Amino acid sequence: MSLTLSELQIRTLKQTLESSKIPFKSEVRLDILSSFKIGGICPVVVEPENSNQVLETLFIFHKSEIPWKILGGGSNLLISDHPDNFVTLRLSGKFKEFEYLEGGKFRIGSATNTTPTFRQISQLGYTGAEFLSTIPGWTGGAVIQNAGCYGGELFDLIQTVEFLRNNEIFVRSPSEIKHGYRFTEFLNEKDSIILGIEILLKEGNLEEIQTSLKDKRDRRNSSQPENKKSAGSVFKNPKIFLENGKEIKAWELIDQAGLRGQIKGGAQISPEHCNFIVNVGAATAADVNYLVELILDKVFQTTGIRLNREIEYFGDIP
């Protein structure tokens, strides 16, 4: 485990950020930034509001030898109980905006909230992104994981991705970015930062779009734990098909292993949808990780199939 940041490092960082007029917050409870409502206190959360401030922040981190991690909407994330050995970068300002360009094109900042953003875009009369209105979190995180559901995924709509890598800003098309089912090359690049995307949609019938939005929302609410503290699907579907063409789902394997409803501390494998782990009390990251490892072991013992995590870990988790 990494060493805790020193008081001198933190004090010097704050002074540098203040002189550079880069917004930040001190002693931030990360649990309130997480849909799991799990996470400890981070010494500093830096909130750059434009690309220049992002670049300057990264320069400060590098010069001061400050370890850092980027946090978005916190919806597909398990945050450490002790995030005190790094500072957190969280985009703000212009990154929270989206705008219509022309011909069905929209530019969307990476810190926009996916559910209201894509619902609002759909209600403007543009179709194709309705499924994204059911996915919580921020657009940047949705890009990194190529978020999707109900037969659609974000990279189906993307025209370009703007991102920062090695202190340089790039704009790339999907054909220039490795991506697949719940995967992009950004997942393995911890120093890359998504700044925004442009998507292309078609004009549609507003009444049909409203129906589609409602159908997808109802479908989600009927099949997933509603109003529960969770991080969504814990594991990716294994992409294994039966002879009749039916896809084997991760939740079916977990259920087959007899783990539905299993509890550890304040965390529980959801009785409603066992590919969800929910915080039913004062769950810790360690509680959740225990259940994650239990699922991995039991599913493999029962079926011979190795599941892969969909949720990401943020910081050191025992």
From Swiss-Prot:
GO biological process: cell division; cell wall organization; peptidoglycan biosynthetic process; regulation of cell shape
Cofactor(s) the protein needs: FAD
Region called Disordered, residue ranges: 212-232
Reaction catalysis annotation: UDP-N-acetyl-alpha-D-muramate + NADP(+) = UDP-N-acetyl-3-O-(1-carboxyvinyl)-alpha-D-glucosamine + NADPH + H(+)
Chief localization: cytoplasm
Pathway of action: Cell wall biogenesis; peptidoglycan biosynthesis
PROSITE patterns recorded: FAD_PCMH
Sample GO molecular function, one term: UDP-N-acetylmuramate dehydrogenase activity
Biased composition (Basic and acidic residues): 213-229
One GO cellular component, as annotated: cytosol
Location(s), subcellular: Cytoplasm
Alphabetized UniProt keyword annotations: Cell cycle, Cell division, Cell shape, Cell wall biogenesis/degradation, Cytoplasm, FAD, Flavoprotein, NADP, Oxidoreductase, Peptidoglycan synthesis
Enzyme Commission code: 1.3.1.98
Pfam families to which the protein is assigned, alphabetical: FAD_binding_4 (PF01565), MurB_C (PF02873)
Active site (catalytic residues): R182, S233, E310
The keyword Ribosomal protein is annotated on this UniProt entry: no
Every FAD-binding PCMH-type domain range: 38-204
Family indicated by similarity: Belongs to the MurB family.
Known role: Cell wall formation.
Name by which UniProt lists this protein: UDP-N-acetylenolpyruvoylglucosamine reductase
Encoding gene per record: murB
